């Protein structure tokens, strides 16, 4: 069962849709992100898993309340909820784009119908239903990707070796520059970003924590974290290889790709126009599986947070089992509906991925720093955490928004020069260091 629970951690609609497009357009620099995941999963298994299982709470943020007060728990869980809503919206939107290309359905209708289906089965079975459904969908997803890659490779006139020849000649397997620049996506920038965002995912993301807590033992929970981390490398490599193979395929047969079909749209176009009907259906199922499993997990875990951190603490402090179930159902529906509206809002952005990164940087950039401040520094106080969070939020907002609003005039001098992926890195470090320095410099007078 733990292996099945890890399937969702290794595949998602973002990896399925974005990775092939990224490899097609550029190279394997983004694959460095995958290489960082085993590092984060190691720390999760060694430190975070036993820690959370010892707390005995379904919320990942009860520790923050114990260390710094109720505000810290509310802050962290609010950041989590905002991040999940943004994540759901971006995935629903990304999911609708290829389905629109594949079947010609209206994007808004795809978003609405998919969301209703996800809300329904999330409500019917709770977390266990999501875990088992994700396992089935995950196998379909991986199987569909492998089949698609094989078809691509063997469609080449000179066989699979031709894909590698073209890719090597055009440097499509490059992992990026090994220079020290912090303004572009070098190997090191991608690796550092991956370590921090995955430490946050494995360390305090409620999606992962729920899986630690549903394991029968510490050993199983640790295995789940490690297995999922290491599984992601070969799985993501398949998706990057699909993008590289697409590049080689359409370079060999340029007449098969219409003008205007670029980036993320190339893979869906290949599915529709180059695969047999049966395989096309399998890939359609895989794409839907990716989005539905990811969004369902976000809805279920978000509803749990609302129940434990808000409803049972501030609205109804002693809810009956029936009231708790009703609160979960209502939360599922509300979160799902909000996700629909966020997805519709993405219709107006130039790049869904850019918008998702900006939102995730703002909403999740400081949670890891706050957690580490309380986890590592036993003497850190409430005031230290508050000062740290304030400083961290300022840095995160500056790095995320200044490049957008400080484009022209003298204000351009104050725009962040750093790559956007480093936002969570600086935000986390600033919160931790500011809180730690506050603890050392602003000692309580006795």
Predicted regions and their residues:
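Membrane-embedded helix-loop-helix hairpins and adjacent transmembrane boundary segments
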Residues: 1-4, 8-446
């Amino acid at each position: 069962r733990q292996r099945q629970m890890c399937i969702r951690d290794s595949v998602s609609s973002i990896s399925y849709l974005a990775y092939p497009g990224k490899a097609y357009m550029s190279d394997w620099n983004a694959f460095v992100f995958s290489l960082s995941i085993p590092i984060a999963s190691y720390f999760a298994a060694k430190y975070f898993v036993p820690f959370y299982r010892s707390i005995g709470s379904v919320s990942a943020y009860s520790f923050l309340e114990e260390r710094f007060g109720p505000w810290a728990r509310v802050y962290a869980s609010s950041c989590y909820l905002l991040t999940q809503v943004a994540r759901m919206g971006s995935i629903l939107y990304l999911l609708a784009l290829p389905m629109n290309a594949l079947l010609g359905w209206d994007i808004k209708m795809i978003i609405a119908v998919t969301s209703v289906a996800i809300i329904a089965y999330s409500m019917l079975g709770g977390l266990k239903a999501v875990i088992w459904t994700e396992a089935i969908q995950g196998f379909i997803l991986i199987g569909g990707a492998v089949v698609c890659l094989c078809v691509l490779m063997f469609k080449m006139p000179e066989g699979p070796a031709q894909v590698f020849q073209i890719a090597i000649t055009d440097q499509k397997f490059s992992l990026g520059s090994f220079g020290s620049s912090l303004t572009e996506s070098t190997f090191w920038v991608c690796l550092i970003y991956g370590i921090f965002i995955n430490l946050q995912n494995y360390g305090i993301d409620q999606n992962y924590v729920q899986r630690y807590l549903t394991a029968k033992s510490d050993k199983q929970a640790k295995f789940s974290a490690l297995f999922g981390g290491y599984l992601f490398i070969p799985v993501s490599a398949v998706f990057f290889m699909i993008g590289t193979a697409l590049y080689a395929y359409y370079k060999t047969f340029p007449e098969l790709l219409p003008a205007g079909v670029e980036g993320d749209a190339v893979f869906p176009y290949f599915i529709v126009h180059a695969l047999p009907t049966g395989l096309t259906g399998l890939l359609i199922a895989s794409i839907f599986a990716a989005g539905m499993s990811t969004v369902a997990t976000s809805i279920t875990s978000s509803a749990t947070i609302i129940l434990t951190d808000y409803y049972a603490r501030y609205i109804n402090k002693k809810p009956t089992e029936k009231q708790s179930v009703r609160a979960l159902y209502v939360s599922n529906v509300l979160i799902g509906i909000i996700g629909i509206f966020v997805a519709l809002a993405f219709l107006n952005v130039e790049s869904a991925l850019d918008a998702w990164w900006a939102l995730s940087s703002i909403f999740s950039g400081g949670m890891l720093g706050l957690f580490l401040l309380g986890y590592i520094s036993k003497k850190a106080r409430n005031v230290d955490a508050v000062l740290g969070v304030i400083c961290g939020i300022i840095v995160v907002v500056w790095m995320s928004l200044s490049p957008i609003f400080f484009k022209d005039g003298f204000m351009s001098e104050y725009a962040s020069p750093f790559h956007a992926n480093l936002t969570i890195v600086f935000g986390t470090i600033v919160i931790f260091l500011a809180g730690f320095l506050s603890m050392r410099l602003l000692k309580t007078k006795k």
